[in-house]
């Protein structure tokens, strides 16, 4: 990227990269604490997706403990938690036609999604993020969807000073096209990276500061997910199924999930 390009710059107290659950929750909590203490705080959340939630692909079963701490009145605020988990089963698939249900007594407590102190919910993680973004903006957070963070801004001594938004109107070979617009610098006293498990800025920071030195290597899997519309007579809102085995090979780590959400929809995924 050319050093001669003249770029606009905006300054914030905190810049957060990624409008997922962690980034938006952090933004909300920062503004809550600032408002409670009467301090002025400028917080910006940058999201590469065209809208918040556009890149949040997973369906999920949520235990709302952290949400309860962040917004004790989340129900009154209209949080999209409308389908409580009602039945929870774990299976081992032997082939395309045979499955063995594991007895509940053999399932670790941490893997149970019904019963317990708090009701769990089958949710759309994308809808939850959109709702969190609304709460963040009400608190005074600036949320910028459609802007991908391209580089980390460092001082000469390596200190992180913010991020550089990617240029717009650039051809495949990197040359400017009609409508070219240089990316803006978002500078901050603190920069929080909430890109997810394998964000490209995070990878650069891990390498630069040797954050993985002496640590176990990360383990990654490919996940596939689909959203099915099924007949109402086959739909059981709140049914939560997990399992492993077929179609994965015996020496392959992974498993599958199947959640009955609202509106006769089923979230199914293979990892």
List the model feature ranges, each with a label:
Residues 178-180, 252-253:
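Residues that act as N-cap/strand-start positions at coil-to-secondary-structure junctions
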Residues 13-44:
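N-terminal Rossmann-like FAD-binding beta1-loop-alpha1 element of flavoenzymes
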Residues 204, 208, 225-252:
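Flavin-dependent oxidoreductases
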Residues 18, 166, 194-195:
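Short, well-ordered coil/turn residues at beta-beta hairpins
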Residues 3-9, 39-172, 182-190, 200-203, ...:
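Conserved N-terminal/central alpha/beta ligand/cofactor-binding core
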Residues 250-271:
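Conserved FAD/dinucleotide-binding core of flavoprotein oxidoreductases
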Residues 212-214, 241-243, 261-268:
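Conserved internal helical-beta-strand scaffold that buttresses enzyme catalytic cores
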């Amino acid at each position: 990227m050319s050093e001669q390009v003249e770029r606009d710059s905006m300054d914030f107290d905190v810049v957060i990269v990624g409008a997922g659950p962690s980034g938006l929750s952090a933004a909300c909590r920062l503004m809550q604490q600032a408002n409670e203490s009467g301090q002025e705080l400028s917080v910006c959340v940058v999201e590469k997706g065209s809208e918040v939630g556009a890149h949040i692909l997973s369906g999920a079963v949520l235990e709302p403990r952290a949400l309860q701490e962040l917004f004790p009145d989340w129900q009154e605020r209209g949080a999209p938690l409308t389908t409580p988990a009602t039945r929870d089963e774990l299976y081992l698939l032997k082939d395309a036609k045979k499955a063995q249900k594991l007895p509940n007594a053999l399932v670790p407590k941490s893997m149970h999604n019904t019963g317990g102190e708090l009701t769990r919910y089958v949710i759309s993680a994308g809808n939850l993020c959109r709702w969190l973004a609304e709460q963040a903006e009400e608190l005074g957070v600036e949320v910028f969807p459609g802007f991908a963070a391209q580089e980390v801004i460092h001082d000469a001594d390596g200190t992180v000073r913010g991020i550089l938004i990617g240029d717009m109107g650039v051809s495949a070979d990197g040359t400017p096209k009609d409508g070219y617009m240089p990316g803006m610098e978002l500078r901050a006293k603190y920069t929080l990276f909430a890109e997810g498990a394998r964000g490209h800025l995070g990878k650069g920071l891990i390498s630069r500061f040797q954050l993985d030195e002496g640590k176990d290597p990360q383990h990654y899997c490919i996940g596939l997910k689909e959203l099915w519309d099924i007949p109402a007579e086959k739909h059981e809102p709140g049914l939560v199924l997990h399992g492993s085995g077929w179609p994965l090979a015996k020496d392959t780590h992974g498993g599958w999930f199947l959640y009955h959400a609202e509106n006769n929809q089923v979230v199914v995924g293979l990892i």
